[in-house]
Amino acid sequence: MNPNQKIITIGSVSLGLVVLNILLHIVSITITVLVLPGNGNNGSCNETVIREYNETVRIEKVTQWHNTNVIEYIERPESDHFMNNTEPLCDVKGFAPFSKDNGIRIGSRGHVFVIREPFVSCSPTECRTFFLTQGSLLNDKHSNGTVKDRSPYRTLMSVEIGQSPNVYQARFEAVAWSATACHDGKKWMTIGVTGPDAKAVAVVHYGGIPTDVIQSWAGDISRTQESSCTCIQGECYWVMTDGPANRQAQYRAFKAKQGKIIGQTEISFNGGHIEECSCYPNEGKVECVCRDNWTGTNRPVLVISSDLSYRVGYLCAGLPSDTPRGEDSQFTGSCTSPMGNQGYGVKGFGFRQGNDVWMGRTISRTSRSGFEVLKVRNGWIQNSKDQIKRQVVVDNLNWSGYSGSFTLPVELTKRSCLVPCFWVEMIRGKPEETTIWTSSSSIVMCGVDHEIADWSWHDGAILPFDIDKM
């Protein structure tokens, strides 16, 4: 057989195979369309199948029609009732790790936001990590100078708890350089403070839509909690400060329902200073442990009732929990007055357990490094130094930062009490390290019925980054 004959033979065989393949497809389609629908045994071919995923990314409505899937993304159904949140706090023996985002480690090569002030808040179906971005990414030129607290680029965003604050999973919440957020059982409410120092505005969002505003009333950097607000039976409470950071300022508690402000009260606290309150629900009231940035190394305590009446004072315990602070042995404690005569401070938290108190603090007395939680017997009502439990979360060789409180609602845990939880921010970069940026990651711990061993769940990123070497 000569070469031309070989080519003709191969071509003929190939053409025959193509024709046979086409015929087989025609037969397959004919059987699918005409025969299978009539046999009564293929009920799933021409119907809609709903797949619900227990996550915030999406719910898929999948329509299957003749072997073709049509996917439509639909919104998560809203709950039809408010959370109660009038239960007492659970009594806990220690705190177990809930999540760790490792955002800075991942951000050395991933698209992760430069952030500060992360916090956690929970709905009946999920917990989310909220954070204030700087409008820039780690290891990028726009991260330069992000040690600054307030800028027009800062926004409140959130991810499902445990995720890094990355570009692909983050959800926009509000334009803000100070913020709070909480869920009433039906929708998320967020408050973002932004604007110039003298005329800042707090914008209330409910279900993602702006619903109300609060204008600065003292004209001096109006600001809020940097942690979860508190919703009880559909009404949500939070605390704001307006005025100097190092002397007497003005303080207000607010109440909103479905994103509309329905009440506010001025908190009279002459000689005391309140900032960055960490609040939680307990037996139908809102209990807050705050920051005194003026003179006290003990923390202000604010208890708010549903009618916005309140009690204000200081955490009674005979151990200081702010930073910087003096020696424990030199501290006496007070339920009514600032003690310690140390300016500045750091956001922190405490939980009432009957008359006892769990309180968090940095291990270092002078810098934001290390972190521990202490349980002090009768520390909520007396100047007690009786430390009955201690747990290390970050060792003193590693940086910490802000810390704050939240609770797991009974809808999540199926318990009859609210589980107390806290988060610890771990600040990296400026001013303590040689970088052009400042950012943070966080570790989240929740109360359990067991004692938990000391360990260090520190940030762990190796600095400087490439951008810092240019």
Swiss-Prot record:
GO CC terms in record: host cell plasma membrane; membrane; virion membrane
Activity regulation note: Inhibited by the neuraminidase inhibitors zanamivir (Relenza) and oseltamivir (Tamiflu). These drugs interfere with the release of progeny virus from infected cells and are effective against all influenza strains. Resistance to neuraminidase inhibitors is quite rare.
Binding positions (substrate): R116, R150, E275, E276, R291, R368
Major place of residence: virion
Pfam families membership: Neur (PF00064)
Key words, A-Z: Calcium, Disulfide bond, Glycoprotein, Glycosidase, Host cell membrane, Host membrane, Hydrolase, Membrane, Metal-binding, Signal-anchor, Transmembrane, Transmembrane helix, Virion
Catalytic function, reaction form: Hydrolysis of alpha-(2->3)-, alpha-(2->6)-, alpha-(2->8)- glycosidic linkages of terminal sialic acid residues in oligosaccharides, glycoproteins, glycolipids, colominic acid and synthetic substrates
Region (Head of neuraminidase) residue spans: 89-470
Swiss-Prot/TrEMBL cofactor(s): Ca(2+)
One of the GO BP terms on file: carbohydrate metabolic process
Membrane-spanning segments: 15-35
Binding site for Ca(2+): D292, G296, D322
Active site per database record: D149, Y402
Topological domain spans for side Virion surface: 36-470
Subcellular location: Virion membrane; Host apical cell membrane
Disulfide bridge map: C90-C417, C122-C127, C182-C229, C231-C236, C277-C290, C279-C288, C316-C335, C421-C446
Residue spans, topological domain Intravirion: 1-14
Membrane topology listed for this record: Single-pass type II membrane protein
EC nos: 3.2.1.18
PTM entry text: N-glycosylated.
Entry-linked Gene3D superfamilies: 2.120.10.10
Entry domain remark: Intact N-terminus is essential for virion morphogenesis. Possesses two apical sorting signals, one in the ectodomain, which is likely to be a glycan, and the other in the transmembrane domain. The transmembrane domain also plays a role in lipid raft association.
Role: Catalyzes the removal of terminal sialic acid residues from viral and cellular glycoconjugates. Cleaves off the terminal sialic acids on the glycosylated HA during virus budding to facilitate virus release. Additionally helps virus spread through the circulation by further removing sialic acids from the cell surface. These cleavages prevent self-aggregation and ensure the efficient spread of the progeny virus from cell to cell. Otherwise, infection would be limited to one round of replication.
HAMAP family reported in the protein's UniProt record: INFV_NRAM
Name by which UniProt lists this protein: Neuraminidase
Organism field: Influenza A virus (strain A/Duck/Memphis/928/1974 H3N8)
Lineage of producing organism: Viruses, Riboviria, Orthornavirae, Negarnaviricota, Polyploviricotina
